[in-house]
Amino acid sequence: GVGRNFFNQIAKPETVRKILLKAYARKEAVTDELIDLLMLPARDAGAVEVFLAFTGYSQGPLPEDLLERLPCPAIILWGDQDPWEPIALGQAFANFPSVKQFIPLAGVGHCPQDEAPELVNPILQNWILEFAAPVGAHSGS
C-alpha cells in the first residue's frame, strides 16, 4: 500500500542522509558509518510495520505525562541548534521535579548523542556514577 511505498522511498541511504543533514548542526557527524548503522533495521523483516506504527503513533504518552510520574531522577541534554524541537521546550521540561539537571549543548542539533558524543558521554557517565546505587544495594541482605 501507500505506507509501504512511502517506507521504500525514505529507507534509502541518500534520503536518510538528507534528513540527518537537516537535523544535525554538526554536518560532519553525518558519516557513511552512521548512515549504514541507521539503515540496518530497515532491512529486518517487519521493518515496514514498525515504521508505520511509529509514524502513525500520535496518541500519548507525551514527555510531560511521563516526567510527571518518573520515579527516578532525570537529566535532559538539549542541542541548542535543534531545528525541530526548540530549546524552550526542553527548558520547560526542566521544571518537572524529576528533572535534576538541564544541560543545553552549544552548537548541537537534534541528536546530541551522535553529533557530539565527546560532550554527551562524559555527562552521562558522571550522571550514572552520581545516581547509580552501590553494587549490592538491592541484594536484600
Set out the residue ranges of the language-model regions.
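Conserved loop-alpha-helix segment in the C-terminal half of the alpha/beta-hydrolase fold
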Residues: R69-V108
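Generic structural signal for small/hydrophobic residues in well-ordered secondary structure
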Residues: I19, L38, F51, I76-G79, ...
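Glycosyltransferase donor-binding loop in the core domain
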Residues: N8, R43, D82, G109-P112
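Catalytic active-site module of serine/aspartate enzymes centered on a nucleophile-bearing elbow/loop
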Residues: S98-S141
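Conserved alpha/beta-hydrolase catalytic His-Asp/Glu region
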Residues: N5-R69
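Active-site helix-initiating loop/hinge in glycosyltransferases
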Residues: L62, P86-L89, E115-A116
